[in-house]
Amino acid sequence: MTGRRCERTTSPGTGGRLRAEPADFQVQEVPAYLPGGSGEYLYLHVEKTRHTTAHVVRELCAQLGVRDRDVGVAGLKDRHAVTTQWLSLPAKVEPRMGDFSLPGVRILETSRHTNKLGMGHLHGNRFVVRVRGAAGMAEQAGETLATLAQGGVPNYFGPQRFGLGGLNAEEGLRVLRGESELRDPRVRRFLTSSVQSAIFNALVSLRLEREVFDRLLTGDMAKKHDTGGVFLVEDAGAETPRAQRGEVSATGTLFGRKVKPLTADAGALEAEALALFGLSPQVFASRKGDRRLIRVFPAEAEVRPEDDGYVLAFTLPKGSFATSVLREVMKTEVDAPGAGPDTTDEGEAGDGE
């Protein structure tokens, strides 16, 4: 169960294969700021192959004698890739860094800064993805990618959020209905976040089906792409031209106690998505909730042909999934390797927490 996910583009797909080896899928974190060079925190620029962020953090703690809560990260990265990101540690461990060793992990750079790195302290992620088994399809890939860069890509949660076959969301539904025997609060939060994500995906799909993906509805909470400002749409006719120019987009609700459901036309569509799961907003009272853009715009989009396929490169805002772009270009479903609480996605953790 991942929530319905209609495609935005109607162009032919390229087909192909992903992740034949880790280097085929590269994720480079785009930090919100760089370390200033001085301060009480040691910043590490780390390259990881076949390691989740959480596993590297655990190894740092074990080898350097620090607590998990003392390690700062801006986002959690997938295991099945080559990923680069910054981490922070108390500066007191710097003399012991020479003792740290983990196969598949390289420290590219170190510096100092005045504050601990916090979750979400990044602008986004740069993806470089090799698609194999798609010889001669680079031009088609480029055309679809250009369409997405111009008009936006559905900001779906990727299959990594749901586990193989969508089992995480199915178990999350049982948790919300009081039918699960799971007691670990961390696992329960992770599973219920999968349900939040599936409902959001269903809402985005409904907006595509009703041809209001790039429009605004009365009652929408819209977000400005340049400043991040959020506002209530009271006159959809007056605001929709801004959406069609890509200046603003609608947001969808990740249900929780601190987020009010939408009203008017937007609220009716959102209620329809929620009804697909047989739930009410009240069952998410244990979650804070959040709002999430229904579309994002791939930036710095490029395609390079290769003998056996092509390489895609693009940048997405934090929290967005490369798989949303890939499924539009390839027109195939992308698998969900090893999804779990420590391997959230190529985007970031924390939506709707």
UniProtKB/Swiss-Prot annotation:
It holds the Pfam family TruD. It catalyses: uridine(13) in tRNA = pseudouridine(13) in tRNA. It comes from the Bacteria. One of its GO terms (biological process) is tRNA pseudouridine synthesis. Residues 152-296 form the TRUD domain. InterPro entries: PsdUridine_synth_cat_dom_sf, PsdUridine_synth_TruD, PsdUridine_synth_TruD_CS, PsdUridine_synth_TruD_insert, TruD_catalytic, TruD_insert_sf, TruD_pseudoU_synthase. Keywords: Isomerase, tRNA processing. Residues 1-21, 332-353 are annotated as: Disordered. Its EC number is 5.4.99.27. The keyword Cell inner membrane does not apply. The keyword Mitochondrion does not apply. One of its GO terms (cellular component) is cytosol. Residues 343-353 have a biased composition (Acidic residues). The active site is at residue 78. One of its GO terms (molecular function) is RNA binding. Belongs to the pseudouridine synthase TruD family. Responsible for synthesis of pseudouridine from uracil-13 in transfer RNAs. HAMAP family: TruD (MF_01082). This is tRNA pseudouridine synthase D. It comes from Deinococcus radiodurans (strain ATCC 13939 / DSM 20539 / JCM 16871 / CCUG 27074 / LMG 4051 / NBRC 15346 / NCIMB 9279 / VKM B-1422 / R1). The lineage of its organism: Bacteria, Thermotogati, Deinococcota, Deinococci, Deinococcales.
